[in-house]
Amino acid sequence: MRSISKEKIVGMLHFVEEQSSFIERTTKHLNSYHDFLISDSAMVLFNSTCMCLQTIGETVRQIDNLTEEALLVENYKEIPWKRIIGLRNILSHEYAAIDPEAIFNTIKIGIPPLLATINSIIADIENGKHNAQCDVSNLSSNSVLFVYVS
């Protein structure tokens, strides 16, 4: 297994946390996926939200690759990590396939548990729980298709 700096992983997790929090703050007023489509400014919010989801998916993919799936997939099974990465791929390459209703459901249903889990992972790493997945010589605490439709 590769040696990965705790600081690097925690920094990447903080980025996922920031992007997820931004999505929550900027979309809390939305009641339906139709709210993304009612005006040009609503479409700007939709596009911004999609970009945040794309960067979350890319960062999760990078963490997954760096830890050889030993951190996220093996330890935090309550989150559909592969679906998050899958959504990133759709947002990056299949623009016409982006479904506003699926994005709305993802942000309303998927982001809150993702945020809670990301905070738990950060705390676990800082408390030494994942020393096997991260380089223990770097202990500084200063130093993630994700769609819920039936």
Give residue ranges: language-model regions:
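Solvent-exposed interaction patches of small proteins and small membrane subunits
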Residues: 1-150
